[in-house]
């Protein structure tokens, strides 16, 4: 989680953190407290307009900026998840222009999606986050995340029997139901009630009824036996697929 340098001085000092300077106030504060003990990174705003110094702020304060003991110049791409978006090149070109002020400094503009845009976006350092765990859709990346959900109980229900809070699911036939130890308090979104799935290997097992705080009920009638656990993901259903079913993005998941 990003923190402001101003107000976090003790944390930076005690944990020997290299702060990222995003504005002139932080630059002055860094020089006042850490100039002799720490190095810093400088973030440039190349178009996302979220954090960092824009072109005017940079060139209007070169005296203070060039006096900083910097070890990295960085920026962040707004549209890196869209390979065809021309804004990626626009930001990269502006980044290169601004970095001419720091010719020998290490540079970084690519986070996870940015690493897939090509070598010209890699510079001296890339900053993969979610990409380390396979959370972005790319056939060349291995997905290493798995969550195993224990089966607590299983039972058989007959046709027209109902399941879960407010009986939002009615059985259309005799079926075997498993109750598993995971609910919305554990991060399984309620939006998946009656339409999500867990997995036995590659076999999907539909979620039936409402997902409750710590429990979820699943149809396992089609499985060869009673499993000890089911999985959140499968080789054909990864974090990005799960996120789409939750109507969100893999970073939030």
Q: What is each model feature region?
A:
Residues 1-7, 11-12:
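Single conserved hydrophobic/aromatic residue that forms the stacking wall/gate
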Residues 11, 41-43, 72, 179, ...:
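Conserved beta-strand segments that form the floor/walls of ligand-binding pockets within enzyme
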Residues 14-15, 76:
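Structured helix-beta-strand junction loops
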Residues 15-19, 106:
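Short active-site oxyanion
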Residues 16, 39, 125, 146-148, ...:
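Broad gene-expression machinery/nucleic-acid interaction feature
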Residues 156-253:
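C-terminal accessory subdomain/extension
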């Amino acid at each position: 989680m990003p923190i402001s340098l101003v107000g976090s001085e003790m944390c930076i000092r005690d944990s020997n953190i290299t702060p990222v300077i995003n504005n002139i106030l932080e630059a002055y504060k860094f020089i006042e407290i850490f100039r002799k003990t720490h190095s810093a990174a400088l973030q440039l705003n190349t178009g996302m307009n979220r954090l960092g110094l824009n072109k005017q702020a940079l060139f209007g304060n070169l005296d203070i900026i060039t006096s900083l003991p910097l070890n990295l110049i960085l920026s962040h791409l707004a549209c890196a998840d869209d390979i065809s978006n021309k804004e990626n090149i626009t930001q990269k070109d502006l980044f290169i222009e601004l970095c001419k002020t720091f010719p020998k400094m290490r540079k970084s503009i690519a986070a996870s999606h940015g690493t897939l845009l090509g070598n010209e976006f890699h510079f001296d350092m890339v900053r993969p986050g979610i990409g380390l765990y396979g959370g972005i859709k790319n056939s060349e990346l291995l997905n290493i995340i798995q969550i195993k959900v224990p089966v607590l109980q299983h039972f058989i229900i007959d046709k027209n029997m109902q399941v879960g809070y407010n009986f939002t699911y009615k059985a259309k036939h005799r079926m075997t139901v498993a109750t598993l130890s995971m609910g919305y308090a554990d991060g399984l979104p309620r939006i998946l009630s009656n339409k999500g799935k867990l997995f036995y290997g590659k076999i999907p097992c539909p979620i039936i009824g409402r997902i409750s705080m710590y429990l979820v009920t699943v149809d396992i009638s089609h499985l060869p036996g009673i499993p000890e656990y089911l999985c959140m993901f499968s080789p054909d259903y990864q974090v990005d697929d799960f996120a789409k079913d939750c109507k969100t993005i893999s970073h939030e998941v």
